[in-house]
C-alpha cells in the first residue's frame, strides 16, 4: 500500500482555520494609567507616537498621558466625528510624522478612529478608554458615520488596553449604564446567532457564544454593585467589555455581541441621530428581542431599570412611533446577518411589542 494511502487525516476531511487577533497587554484598575509607559516599553515600541483624543479629554487625561510620555516623541491631535474624511485626515497626519503606534485616549469615537487608521496603515494602537459606554474598547470592529447612517467596518483590535477605573468611574453615570446595557445585549445576540444557524445554516463558535453569554449573565448578577457607579463598578464593567471583545475576536466577527438588538439600535440612531446613546438603544432593543424570543424579558428589563438605563421610548426621550419604525426597518441594517428582527413583523405586532415595554 502506498504511503499516501496510510494518512490518518485524508485530504479535505478538516479544513477549518482561524487567525485570532487579541490584545497582548491588558492593564485595568486603580491608577492603571500610570502603567502606560511600562506597557509601551513592554511592547518594544520605539519611534514617533500619535496621541488621539477628544477636545475636552485632551486637556485632562490627554495632558497626563503627555506628561507620562515626556521622554518620547509624541504628537497629539483632536479627532472629530468618525467619518471617512476624518479618518483620511488622521491617516495623513500619522504618515507625515511617521507614527509607529497610536494611543487612543477617550470614548468610542476616538477609539474607533484609531482602530480604522491603525488597520488602514497597518500600525498598532493602544486603547485608553475614559468611559465604559460600549464594548468597542476591545473589539476589532468600528462604526463609521455616513450620509445613510452608521456602518460597521473591520478594523484592528488594540494591541494593548489601559483602563484606569478611577478615570472611568469619574465619567457621567449615564455612560457606564449604557455600557452595561451593551453587555446585557449579548443575551439576545447569542440567541439570534443560534437562530441563524437553524434558519440559514450559518456557522457558529460555541466558545464565543459561551463567553458572550457568561458576560451578559455576570452583568445581570452584579447589577446591584454596578449601580453604585464607583471604581468597583467600573472594574466589573470594564472586565465584561474586554471579555465581550475577546468573544468577537474568537468568532472573527461581532456576531457574539451583536444581533437584532444592535440592528434595531443602529436603525434608531439613523432615525434620530444624536438623540440616544448606542448602549441605551441596544438595551431597549434587547428587551424587544427577548420578548420576540419568548425569553425572560422582564429579568432584562428589571436589571436595566436597577442601574437607571432606559427601558421604554419615553425613557429614551423619543416617540413610540419612532421605535415602531425602528423595529420594522431594523432588517435593513446588515441584511446578510439573520436575526429575529428579520422575521416577518407586521405593524400591529410592532405596536404590541412597544406596548409591552410599558408593562409592569
UniProtKB/Swiss-Prot annotation:
The keyword Kinase does not apply. GO terms for biological process: glycerophospholipid metabolic process; phospholipid biosynthetic process. Catalyzes the NAD(P)H-dependent reduction of dihydroxyacetonephosphate (DHAP or glycerone phosphate) to glycerol 1-phosphate (G1P). The G1P thus generated is used as the glycerophosphate backbone of phospholipids in the cellular membranes of Archaea. Its main location: cytoplasm. Pathway: Membrane lipid metabolism; glycerophospholipid metabolism. Substrate binds at residues 135, 182, 266. Binds 1 zinc ion per subunit. It is found in: Cytoplasm. GO terms for molecular function: glycerol-1-phosphate dehydrogenase (NAD+) activity; glycerol-1-phosphate dehydrogenase (NADP+) activity; metal ion binding. Its EC number is 1.1.1.261. It is an enzyme of class 1 (oxidoreductase). PANTHER family: GLYCEROL DEHYDROGENASE, GLYCEROL DEHYDROGENASE 1. This is Glycerol-1-phosphate dehydrogenase [NAD(P)+]. Transmembrane segments: none annotated.
